[in-house]
């Protein structure tokens, strides 16, 4: 959350939360989740930024990636913790932007089918966070003497063995 220096934005924060969660950085997630609670709209969704030149109405893109961040943080975006005083959840806010065609609108005020909004809404409604790949790194291999180094040992920190 960069709100101390800028207005912050929900999208960048969502990707940071998901990356931190994938890397096991759960202690760093609380400020971002508090940021989301502080700017959540009464309908349950989020705008890109508050304040914003785009307005502060809920948009599908920002709501979708925020839902993914909540999921990555191990919370339920349809649960009581994310239900507004008006009784709305992030999931309901996103579902409300789905058109009869099955596609999603960016905002209620711009109801046309929006490809990016649709692409971002689908994994969020499927309950999936952004799919970060992880890799297990094994123990470092024993250092080896390499003739080209004049007999010097290779730095053990560079001698990684991937499994």
Question: What kind of region is each of these model predictions?
Answer:
Residues 1-31, 42-87, 99-100, 104-133:
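An alpha-helical repeat/solenoid feature that recognizes helix-turn-helix modules
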Residues 31-32, 158:
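A general marker of short, structured functional hotspots
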Residues 37-41:
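Compact integral membrane and secretory-pathway proteins
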Residues 93, 109-161:
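Terminal, non-catalytic domain-edge segments
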């Amino acid at each position: 959350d960069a709100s101390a220096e800028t207005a912050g934005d929900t999208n960048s924060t969502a990707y940071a939360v998901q990356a931190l969660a994938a890397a096991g950085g759960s202690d760093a997630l609380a400020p971002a989740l508090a940021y989301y609670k502080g700017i959540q709209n009464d309908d349950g969704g989020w705008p890109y930024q508050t304040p914003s030149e785009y307005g502060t109405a809920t948009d599908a893109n920002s709501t979708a990636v925020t839902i993914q961040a909540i999921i990555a943080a191990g919370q339920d975006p349809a649960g009581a913790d994310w239900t507004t005083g008006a009784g709305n959840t992030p999931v309901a806010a996103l579902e409300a932007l789905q058109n009869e065609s099955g596609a999603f609108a960016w905002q209620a005020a711009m109801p046309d089918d929006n490809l990016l909004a649709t692409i971002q809404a689908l994994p969020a409604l499927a309950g999936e966070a952004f799919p970060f790949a992880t890799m297990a790194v094994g123990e470092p291999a024993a250092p080896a003497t390499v003739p080209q180094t004049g007999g010097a040992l290779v730095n053990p920190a560079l001698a990684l063995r991937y499994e």
